Amino acid sequence: MDEPVRLVGFTLNLQPYFRPMATLLPARGHAPVLDASVWLAPNATVVGEVHMGAESTVWFSAVVRGDVARIQIGRRVNIQDGAVIHGTFVQSQTVLEDDVSIGHNAIVHGAHVKHSALIGMGSVVMDHVIVGEGAVVAAGAVVLAGTTIEDGELWAGVPAKCRGQVSDSLREHLSQTAARYVEYAGWFQDDGAPGE
């Protein structure tokens, strides 16, 4: 909002007055615990027993709901726009290890996603799923409850099935994704606006 809003007949500069903030809420006696370097989009929501590691990011309209089960998020995890992270009461907590990427509008519900894995856009990963290190769940896939995806596997379809191994080129791309999202978050950092 660095530029003033121009309306018919007058100009309105909202920068000094409008400071959108993410929603952080306690639930069942637990408040989110975030490393100081975590970046949250202004309309992201983080609720309850959520622990987030250094340089992790939660993007626009994403929801991380630790109200019914603990959510543990490692370092440099990116939870992209519209994604939902949740669990099932008394049954399944969610763990996202370091350098995990959760694609736009994906749902991860009570699963354990290991280091450097990618959950593709619009996919659904259900309770008690284990996604191996460097594995990929393709866009739009539905991984049924209790499934184990081995390290480096590529799963796709509804219901999702193993379609082979992650290619070398995709593995290289994934190795850079977490660092890129840390960089992207830097583009939104406060630049010394009034009141800071």
What are these regions (language model features)?
Residues 1-20:
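N-terminal amphipathic/basic-hydrophobic helices that include classical n-h-c signal peptides
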Residues 17-34, 67-88, 92-96, 104-196:
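Glycine-rich hexapeptide-repeat left-handed beta-helix
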Residues 101:
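Short proline/glycine- and basic residue-enriched helix-capping loop/turn segments at helix->loop/beta transitions
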Residues 22-58:
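N-terminal segments that cap or nucleate solenoid repeat domains
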